[in-house]
A protein has these predicted regions:
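Residues on the lipid-exposed face of transmembrane beta-strands in outer-membrane beta-barrel proteins
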Residues: 82-88, 129-133, 180-184, 227-233
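Outer-membrane beta-barrel transmembrane domain signature of Gram-negative proteins
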Residues: 171-174, 199, 203-268
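Transmembrane beta-strands of outer-membrane beta-barrel pores
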Residues: 70-74, 90-92, 103-107, 147-151, ...
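Outer-membrane beta-barrel translocator/receptor signature
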Residues: 13-15, 28-30, 41-53, 57-112, ...
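Flexible loop and strand-edge segments within Gram-negative outer membrane beta-barrel domains
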Residues: 106-126, 132-134, 138-193, 199-223
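Short acidic/polar hinge/loop motifs at secondary-structure boundaries
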Residues: 2, 9-36
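Short loop/turn motifs that connect adjacent beta-strands in outer-membrane beta-barrel proteins
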Residues: 59-63, 90-94, 137-140, 186-192, ...
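Membrane-embedded beta-strand positions of outer-membrane beta-barrel proteins
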Residues: 64-68, 97-101, 129-131, 143-145, ...
């Protein structure tokens, strides 16, 4: 019952949230904002338990960074991670762009030797960018995009096809997400008017089955988008004290198409 937000936009659908934060690479995150409780239900029915807001990195200065780590679990399984970040900002701060890329690979881990994995096989590639342009001193246009290509599998008999095993959970995700926003400030930055739109498309091929079930293959397409506008005004005195006034309008849409041919299931 927690909603994941990307830069305050609820574009992470219930389907994308199945594996949740594990599909978001660390090197794209600037900070994480957590709101607990039903007060966050303004973002929708998925948020009655709270929200997790992922704020991605903004270009601040010219920089480049590459990192790589290797980890081992009980001397059995290796996990590899590689990440790269780069940012470029103009001298007058008129425009800037931040790029990131990450790669993660993990072999299946069987902790108790029963032949079934406690941690599944994982292979994930992610690329993204965030850029801005300031047409004037009091306006800003921002654009962001990121894509994730992920394969994961858990169960047993990893050398066989999923329908030849005792039990397998296997998914392949291709996720594309982007957003565009325009911010207009008044002088002294006491008032702000924003227009924004964000979209995310998920394409998933899956297998959830046991006992050599050849019918358990599925294919799912999911599209989520949101668009809206917001005004924020700061006033030095309203009646007897300073005040902030916020107003906005937002529209959200989520469409899902799930097909399992073996079970003659076609849901929209």
């Amino acid at each position: 019952y927690s909603q994941i937000l990307i830069n305050s936009r609820p574009v992470v659908s219930a389907l994308s949230g199945v594996y949740g934060l594990e599909q978001i690479p660390v090197n794209m995150i600037e900070r994480v904002e957590v709101v607990r409780g039903g007060g966050s239900a303004l973002f929708g029915a998925n948020a009655v338990g709270g929200t997790i807001n992922i704020i991605t990195k903004d270009p601040i200065n010219n920089s480049f960074q590459v990192s790589s780590t290797m980890s081992n679990m009980n001397g059995k399984v290796w996990e590899q991670y590689m990440g790269a970040n780069a940012s470029l900002v103009s001298k007058d701060n008129t425009y800037g762009i931040a790029l990131y890329q990450s790669y993660r690979n993990r072999n299946p881990y069987d902790a108790d030797g029963d032949g079934f994995s406690e941690l599944g096989k994982l292979n994930m590639n992610t690329f993204g960018l965030r850029t801005y342009y300031r047409p004037t001193q009091f306006s800003r246009i921002s654009l962001e995009y990121h894509t994730t290509n992920e394969f994961r599998r858990g169960g047993n008999k990893f050398d066989l096809q999923p329908h030849e095993t005792d039990i397998t959970e296997q998914t392949k995700h291709v996720i594309n997400s982007g957003g565009l926003s325009y911010d207009l400030f008044w002088k002294e930055y006491k008032h702000k008017l924003s227009f924004y739109s964000s979209i995310q498309h998920t394409d998933r091929n899956s297998y959830y089955g046991a006992q050599q079930d050849a019918n358990a293959y599925g294919k799912t397409k999911d599209l989520t988008w949101v668009a809206g506008g917001m005004y924020v005004g700061n006033f030095e005195k309203v009646l007897f004290s300073p005040a902030t006034f916020t107003a906005g309008l937002e529209y959200q849409n989520n469409s899902l198409h799930d097909v399992m041919t073996g079970y003659h299931r076609d849901m929209k």
